[in-house]
Each structure stands twice: as C-alpha cells, then as structure tokens.
Amino acid sequence: MCEFPINYVEIEHVYSQTIGAGYRTVAITSAKQGEGKTSLIKALAKRARLSDKNVLVVELNTFNPTLSAKLREFPDHGKTEIISPKQQGYNLLPAPRNIQEIMRYKETHVLSEAINDWLESYDCIFFDTSALQSLNQSNIPPEIVCEVCEGTILIIEAGNTPANLIEEGIDKLKTRKVNLIGSIINDKSNPSLLSELIRE
C-alpha cells in the first residue's frame, strides 16, 4: 500500500472538497480492488487530524481488510470495537469478522443508526468500502455504505480499470441515489512522460 504525504496538493484538494466543504461522513469506493482507496483514506484522515478534527475510519471492506490486517493475528472476541492505532492520529473500527455483525451492517437503517452514534464522538468519519464489483457473500455492499454517507468519492485507476466496470459501478451508485462528490483518477499505472518519450 502506498503512503501519500499529506502535504500533496492533490490530497489538499480532495480534503477541501469533502471535509473542508462540511461533509462529515465520506465513503471512498472504487470500481475494482487495488485502486488506492485505503491509501487515500489514510492520507485524508491524517489531514483532518491536522485541523484538530476527531477522526474515525470505519473499514467495511470485508473482502480485503487492509487496515485491519495486522489485527487479524489476535483472536476475535465477538463484537468489533473501535481502537486507536499508535502513531496514526485517528481511531479505527476494524472490518467485522463475525457473520452476524456483517449481516447487520448490510441493513441501511442499522448502519445509519451506527453513524448517528459515532457522530456524537467524532467530527468526521471515513468509510473504506469493498470495490463495487466485489461480489462475495460476506461483503458489505459498498453501494449501501455510500448511500448512508453524506458524500462518496469513486477512485478509478487510469489505464487499468475497464470502462464497463466504471459504468456499472456508477450505475449502482445512481440506483441508490448516492451523492457522488467526484472521481479521482489514480495514474500509478500510466507511464511517465519521460518513459513515453524514450519509447517513441
């Protein structure tokens, strides 16, 4: 996973269009896995902390729970609880492992109630979702998470994400009447100008 410096102008632009614009709950999703959702969330959470915001990151990506990966070595004691990872500057609700908890988060009203409770203690909440095309029985559908958030950002990997997956993902979000704040083009797979000039 790539770590973005929080002083990148791109991070500042995304922050100003989300938390800086008054959004308190923001879901980050993508058309397919590996497009950079988690890296962006970590950078935005750290940026929000610099503005003295009390930040919660909720990992609902049960397909590939990157943020919770280190926690997997510890036994599961039932209900998932919020933790404060050292040196992160934000609190984290790890991805649920208990099937009953996963099924509850698939219910819009349950997730909405949880968000209302969390907002009593936190200034802003970022949601790390599964990719829109990740179909798995234990996934929490990302379009449900996006629906209950005030805004959503869609990440697309340039040169790697097929157009049909992007269209299908946007259609899923439209069907749920999701407030799509915008899209971010991740150009990590695009060749640099120098390499293109050398190739020519």
Question: What are these model-derived regions, one by one?
Answer:
Residues 1-35, 62, 66, 160-200:
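Short boundary/hinge segments that flank catalytic cores
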Residues 26-44, 48-50:
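Glycine-rich phosphate-binding P-loop
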Residues 2-5, 12, 16-17, 29-34, ...:
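P-loop/Walker-type NTP enzyme "switch/lid" segment
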Residues 50-52, 87, 175-178:
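Short, well-ordered coil/turn elements that cap or connect secondary structure elements
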Residues 106-124, 129-200:
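Conserved catalytic-core segment of NTP-binding enzymes
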Residues 23, 52-53:
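Short coil/turn connectors at secondary-structure junctions
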Residues 46, 54, 199-200:
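Short, charged/polar low-complexity linear motifs in solvent-exposed/disordered segments
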